[in-house]
């Protein structure tokens, strides 16, 4: 699995296509052969997964109890908006209109490597979801990254 990192300013053309940044593209597993999965993010963004990474998530979702009403509601919303997309010879991918609307994308976009996935944002919305206060960021780092007694 590739490790996606970095923050990139990109554009979407009139047909809804974007060029995947070279650094992101180079980290896609060869086994996926230029095919990626786009889905709605929990926030107002689009999430891009390699097919290899998405299969791991799919396995978790498909292993849940289908007889649970709560699970079925989750599953319905999870699968809503998932699109398998192929990169063309120029490294472009077509963003479906429904996902463009979900993320409120226009011409300018921000692409953010997030380790095992990539987020695609409207630049203005992206800024709203960033922490502006360094002490708040430090508190979250302490909460989630500080060693536990087991370590």
UniProtKB/Swiss-Prot annotation:
It is found in: Cytoplasm, Nucleoid. GO terms for molecular function: DNA-binding transcription factor activity; transcription cis-regulatory region binding. Keywords: Cytoplasm, DNA-binding, Repeat, Transcription, Transcription regulation. One of its GO terms (cellular component) is nucleoid. It comes from the Bacteria. The keyword Nucleus does not apply. GO terms for biological process: negative regulation of DNA-templated transcription initiation. Residues 7-53, 82-125 form the SpoVT-AbrB domain. HAMAP family: MraZ. Belongs to the MraZ family. Forms oligomers. This is Transcriptional regulator MraZ. It comes from Cytophaga hutchinsonii (strain ATCC 33406 / DSM 1761 / CIP 103989 / NBRC 15051 / NCIMB 9469 / D465). The gene is mraZ.
